[in-house]
Each structure stands twice: as C-alpha cells, then as structure tokens.
Curated annotation (Swiss-Prot):
Provenance organism: Heterodactyla hemprichii
Disulfide bond entries: C43-C75, C52-C68, C57-C72
Propiece span(s): 22-40
Secretion signal, residue range per the UniProt entry: 1-21
Record site: Key residue for binding both Kv1.2/KCNA2 and Kv1.3/KCNA3 (occludes the channel pore like a cork in a bottle): K62
Name this protein carries in UniProt: Kappa-thalatoxin-Hhe2a
Coiled-coil region list: none
Site description Important residue for binding Kv1.3/KCNA3, residues in chain: I47, K49, R51, S60, M61, Y63, F67
Domain ShKT per the UniProt entry, residue ranges: 43-75
Organism classification: Eukaryota, Metazoa, Cnidaria, Anthozoa, Hexacorallia
GO cellular component: extracellular region; nematocyst
GO molecular function: potassium channel regulator activity; toxin activity
Additional facts recorded: In PubMed:21339955, this protein is called kappa-TLTX-Hh1a. The TATX abbreviation is given to this protein, since the abbreviation TLTX was already given to a spider family.
Keywords: Cleavage on pair of basic residues, Disulfide bond, Ion channel impairing toxin, Nematocyst, Neurotoxin, Potassium channel impairing toxin, Secreted, Signal, Toxin, Voltage-gated potassium channel impairing toxin
Length: 75
C-alpha cells in the first residue's frame, strides 16, 4: 500500500512538472511571435503589481540570475 502511494505521488509530481515546463515554453514562443521576447529579458527593477501573480513572479525569476537582479521586487 505504501509503495502505491509513493508511486502515485511521484506520478503526479512528474505530470505537474511536465505541464509547468510546457506552459513556460509556450509562453516563450508567444513572446517571440509578439516581439516581447527581448522586453521580458531586459533588466527592470520591479514588476507592476497588476502583473505580479505567483506564476509571473516565478517565471521571471527564471532569468533573474543571468539578466537581472530584482525582476520580482514587488511580489
């Protein structure tokens, strides 16, 4: 029974990671088409509170170390 629970949790975690990765890649493709691909990666001090959702904050942190210092300052 324990093994089945562990297997179920691992399967759910794997599925969630695949969904999140696919969503982030889809967002990057949309940015390329819209021309905002470079804007996202330019250094900004803060994200406006209107755009500061948990997903937006997490997604912008992806580029934090190589491009910016405080991309999610208002989150």
């Amino acid at each position: 029974m324990k093994f089945q629970m562990i297997a179920a949790v691992l399967l759910i975690a794997f599925c969630l990671s695949v969904v999140v990765t696919a969503r982030m890649e889809l967002q990057d493709d949309e940015d390329m088409k819209n021309g905002s691909f470079q804007k996202r990666r330019t250094c900004i001090d803060t994200i406006p509170k209107s755009r500061c959702t948990a997903f937006q904050c997490k997604h912008s942190m992806k580029y934090r170390l190589s491009f910016c210092r405080k991309t999610c300052g208002t989150c």
